[in-house]
Amino acid sequence: NPPSGEVITANNKIIPDDYPYLITNDWAEPYRITRITDLLENVQKHSLLTFAQIQLDQTSLMAQEFLPYLLELTPETSLERSALAELLSWDGTMDRNKAAPLIFSAWYRELAKLIYSDELGETFEDYYGFRPLFVSSVLANETKTKWCDDTRTPAEESCEFVESKAFKEAIVYLSNTYGSDISKWQWGTAHYAHSDHAILTDTPLGRFFDIKIPNGGDAFTVNAARFGIGNDEPFTQTNGPGYRALYDLSNLDNSLFIHTTGQSGNPLSGHYQDFAETWRDGRYIPMTMKREDIEKGKMGTLTLNP
């Protein structure tokens, strides 16, 4: 019961450096916990609505941190100029309907590869990931580090060179994958929440029952939507908040919840995926607590016999 009245966790480090016992060395970066804290402290009196807004927040502090490096680049083609124009007015919100999150994520994917693939060699694929604290340290301390230099070439590459090369390669990748019309680029086209069927996923029928829905967010937004930049589909969402709930402890009947996909695991049921868009769009359903209300709203009874 801390004096602040706040209990917050986002897989972040929750212990001081001198804590005597090992819990883990694999803490999440501080972006999400920082954003949650800011959103909590910016409102004097919260409600279910303001807590819902926190749960659904898609502002990436990680993107905001790295965006200035992108905006310093000089574009050389019309497509590069159009891409940078998208980023100039972008605030780091990972909106599924916008091109900027896709451009940024593609650039960062190439940037990480260029910074440390040469040093790691054959082991690179095992460690290919965001690692934003490391990458940020490299870019901020160029005079003290050689990570930006490509050890496979005789020249000594600067971080500015690597940032620019990553941007060019990202634009080529995006144009080859999504076409050269930036107005048709959308984050959700590449970044979709993918839910496999629990049983059928490894069968020939599995792909017919997968649930795929365009989604916003990234690994560093409060509304987490992690993806693996080293994967074959580098922007496909691999995990996120499978269940959201808002509990009103003064009146539990006001509580709300939602989870991904649907209540049924039967692909032929109308409730197999009827929650998917509700979940994605940040809507909730009532958490019915009273037995009489549950009976009124039930759609059937499933009886399990031994």
Regions from the PLM with identified roles:
Residues 85:
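Cationic-aromatic interfacial patches
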Residues 1-72, 76-79, 89-306:
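C-terminal/peripheral segments of proteins
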Residues 82:
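Active-site acid/base region of carbohydrate-active enzymes
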